[in-house]
């Protein structure tokens, strides 16, 4: 009978764990990209932030000036800090995307900071910013443009490599002639089977 009680206990513990996990998932289910100020500095980072309700936004605005963690989240989000840190580590290299969206997001957040507008940004808008040279690029955009050039060159390399693979017959004949004028080591290796035969004959 003790086996049944142990199984029932583990089952109830598993149910409790599932409830906790589902509650945590429900808390962090909706994410949006936002400009977040880092601490007391004027540094702003464009990163994924969990969407908060309007009531929670008012609470966090009143609490954020007094208690703000170094990663930019209010202190009441410390319960999910391990989940948030893992998610941040995976997306920490997305600063290049933030530079492209910087102008659009700044204008939209100044007019109305609703999450629908920040979500409505699509990658189709990136071409508008890249082709628009009327405004001087920021430091991050200059860095963004430099790596994009080698990436396009790298993307062009595989087709050129596949095109160069078929070798014409003329070049093959030229290579065979070069092989005949190989260094003495190669000649010796080619002639090696003939050497034992002459030694066995004498």
Curated annotation (Swiss-Prot):
InterPro entries: BCL7. Residues 90-99 have a biased composition (Polar residues). Keywords: Apoptosis, Differentiation, Phosphoprotein, Wnt signaling pathway. Residues 107-123 have a biased composition (Low complexity). Positive regulator of apoptosis. Plays a role in the Wnt signaling pathway, negatively regulating the expression of Wnt signaling components CTNNB1 and HMGA1. Involved in cell cycle progression, maintenance of the nuclear structure and stem cell differentiation. May play a role in lung tumor development or progression. Belongs to the BCL7 family. This is B-cell CLL/lymphoma 7 protein family member B. It comes from Bos taurus. The gene is BCL7B.
């Amino acid at each position: 009978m003790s086996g049944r009680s142990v199984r029932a206990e583990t089952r109830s513990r598993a149910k409790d764990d599932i409830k906790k996990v589902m509650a945590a998932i429900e808390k962090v289910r909706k994410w949006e990209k936002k400009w977040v100020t880092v601490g007391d500095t004027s540094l702003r980072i464009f990163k994924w932030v969990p969407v908060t309700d309007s009531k929670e936004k008012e609470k966090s605005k009143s609490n954020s000036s007094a208690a703000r963690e170094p990663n930019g989240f209010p202190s009441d989000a410390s319960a999910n800090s391990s989940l948030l840190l893992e998610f941040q580590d995976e997306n920490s290299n997305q600063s290049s995307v933030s530079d492209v969206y910087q102008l659009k997001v700044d204008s939209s957040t100044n007019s109305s900071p609703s999450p629908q507008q920040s979500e409505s940004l699509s990658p189709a808008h990136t071409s508008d910013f890249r082709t628009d040279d009327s405004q001087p690029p920021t430091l991050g955009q200059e860095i963004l443009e430099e790596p994009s050039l080698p990436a396009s060159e790298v993307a062009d390399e595989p087709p050129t490599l596949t095109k160069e693979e078929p070798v014409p017959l003329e070049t093959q004949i030229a290579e065979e002639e070069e092989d005949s004028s190989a260094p003495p080591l190669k000649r010796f290796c080619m002639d090696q089977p003939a050497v034992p035969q002459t030694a066995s004959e004498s």
